[in-house]
Amino acid sequence: MPDDLYDRDALAWSEHQASLLRRVARGERVNEVDWEHVIEEIEDVGLSELHAVQSDLHQMMVHLLKVHGWPSSPSVGRWRGEFVAFQKDAARRFAPSMRQTIDLARHYRDALEQLETADYEGTSPRARPADCPFNLDQLFGDKRAALEQHLEAAAAGIKA
C-alpha cells in the first residue's frame, strides 16, 4: 500500500490497517503496520467520544436555560424535546473515565454566555443561577422535569 494512503483515503487506510492488525493478532510478523497513525487514531476515538458528550452537555444546559428563561415562549415544547434527545445521546456515549475530564462549571458558563444576548419574543430571560446547579449524575439520570424544577429552585434562591 502507498505510504500516503492515510492522507488520501482514510477508509481504505483503516481497512488495510485493520487487516494487518488481525494478521498480527494471529501471530504473523507484519512490517507494514502504520503504528504512528494507528496509535493516533486510537487516541482520537476516545477524544471524539469525549467531545461528543461535552457538546451534548452544553446543548442540554442551553435548552434547560432557554426553558427556564422564557417559559411562555412557543418554542418551549421544541426545546424540551431537543433537551431529551441531547440527554439520551450524552448518556449513551458517557463513560466513567470521562467524569474526571468534564468541566461542568465551564460548560454551564459557556451556555450562559451563549444565551447572554438571546432575545426570544422581545423579552429578556428570567434570573438564573450564576453557578451550575447540576452535577453529572443529575444531568444524565434525572428526568427533564426534575432538572427544570432543580433549576427553578436554584434561581429562586438568588432572588431572595
Regions found by a protein language model. Name each.
Residues 1-160:
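Surface/interface-facing alpha-helical segments and adjacent flexible terminal/loop regions used
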